[in-house]
Regions:
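Acidic/histidine-rich catalytic neighborhood of metal-dependent amide-processing enzymes
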Residues: 1-63, 87, 109-111, 196-199, ...
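His/Asp/Glu-rich mid-to-C-terminal helical/loop segments that flank catalytic regions of hydrolases
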Residues: 21-22, 87-105, 133-137, 180-189, ...
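Short beta-strand-to-loop capping motifs
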Residues: 54, 72-74, 130-134, 227-231
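A short beta-alpha structural unit
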Residues: 127-129, 163-175, 213, 224-234, ...
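Long, well-ordered mid-to-C-terminal structural blocks that present hydrophobic/aromatic surfaces
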Residues: 187-250
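Zn-dependent metallopeptidase/amidohydrolase metal-coordination segment
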Residues: 200, 207-221, 228, 283-343
């Protein structure tokens, strides 16, 4: 038995990328990185990150402006692959909607925007600092109240804990230059987010998606917007990244892409899968579900370097992955362990 431990799986797949082509000698690989007990995974999506960088300058804040901070919080967030079909609200998108509306009607000036963190998580919090002419202050606050009420009604079934707050700020000295503000806000509103296509090969499986992961001011001259695209079809993954690039390029950003990673094409005739299903049925008296997942597993990279490998992936039940609410269902751990031990006894 060989044991393969990798580093940096959550943020960059560095360990899997650096795996040598002559390190493994086995013909079977059992990946222990899945999140639903009772389900055996035999395929996954490939992924790529698309990063937009806006170069900006700060200008002196105009006179007679009142400044505010808007916060969006308490969204569910979740994994940007496995949870992308659940309709989770994106905090970056939500803040951008308010800014866009303010630009149309109230001569809004943006000073700061911060939202999201991990590239592979649906962002659950974001905030922005901005100003409107003091003569529009009371009218803007009324518009905000209507906007917040509309959002709470819009999100009430999918985000019951959603919060949006508006607080007046002390005087702000600087605001973003007008060109960058326009490009940033319009692209955040316009860029696709969520499910792009469902799979025709495996009904119920998301084929292609994109996630507006984070918006960060970096240094004193850059705003970096990080997005991630996933697909079980390589050409669709590339096209999704081109779609995202096009929106940000039109908005004046410099756009780059990560190296990306391949998907894992299912092999329903795998001997290892046959052994795994038989072991599960013997141990627990029911057949496991066999499916693919719309998330990035290292298996695609392993298969690229070891094309002869037969692979399955399973694990105990996890929820809220890649969010502060991540948790493990302890009762599923013994079943996970017993299944692994039984499979290892049977493989040759």
């Amino acid at each position: 038995v060989e044991a393969l431990f990798t580093v940096d799986e959550e943020t960059g797949l560095t360990g899997a990328f650096e795996l040598g082509e002559e390190m493994l000698t086995g013909k079977y690989l059992i990946n222990l990185d899945s999140e639903d007990e009772g389900e055996i995974f035999i395929g996954c999506a490939g992924g790529i990150d698309t990063i937009a960088t806006f170069r900006y300058t700060m200008e002196e804040a105009p006179k007679n402006y009142s400044f505010f901070r808007v916060d969006v919080s308490d969204l569910q967030g979740g994994h940007s692959g496995d949870d992308i079909d659940k309709g989770r609200v994106n905090s970056n998108k939500t803040v951008a909607r308010l800014l866009w509306d303010g630009m149309q009607s109230f001569e809004l000036k943006l000073s700061y925007f911060n939202g999201g963190n991990l590239r592979n998580a649906i962002p659950r919090e974001a905030y922005a600092i901005f100003g409107v002419p003091t003569r529009f202050k009371s009218e803007f606050v009324k518009r905000y109240d209507l906007f917040a009420a509309d959002l709470k009604a819009e999100f009430r079934f999918r985000e019951p804990n959603f919060k949006i707050t508006l607080n007046e700020m002390p005087e702000v000295d600087q605001v973003l230059d007008a060109r960058t503000q326009f490009g940033l806000v319009y692209s955040l509103v316009g860029v696709p987010n969520g499910v792009i296509a469902m799979s025709f090969a495996m009904p119920g499986l998301v084929e292609t998606s994109t996630n507006l992961a984070s918006v960060k001011f970096e240094g004193d001259d850059r705003i970096v917007v990080t997005t991630s695209q996933r697909s079980s079809v390589e050409s669709a993954k590339v096209y999704a990244s081109q779609m995202i690039e096009s929106v940000f390029a039109l908005a004046g950003a410099e756009v780059s892409h990560s190296e990306g990673y391949p998907g894992w094409a299912p092999n329903p005739q795998s001997k290892l899968l046959e052994i795994t299903v038989a072991s599960y049925e013997k141990l627990f008296g029911v057949k496991p579900k066999v499916r693919a997942i719309h998330a990035g597993l290292e298996c695609g990279l392993f298969l690229e370097k070891y094309p002869h490998l037969e692979m399955v992936s399973f694990g105990p039940t996890l929820r809220g992955v890649h969010s502060p609410d991540e948790r493990l269902e302890i009762a599923t751990v013994p079943k996970f362990w017993d299944l692994l031990a039984d499979i290892l006894k049977k493989v040759e």
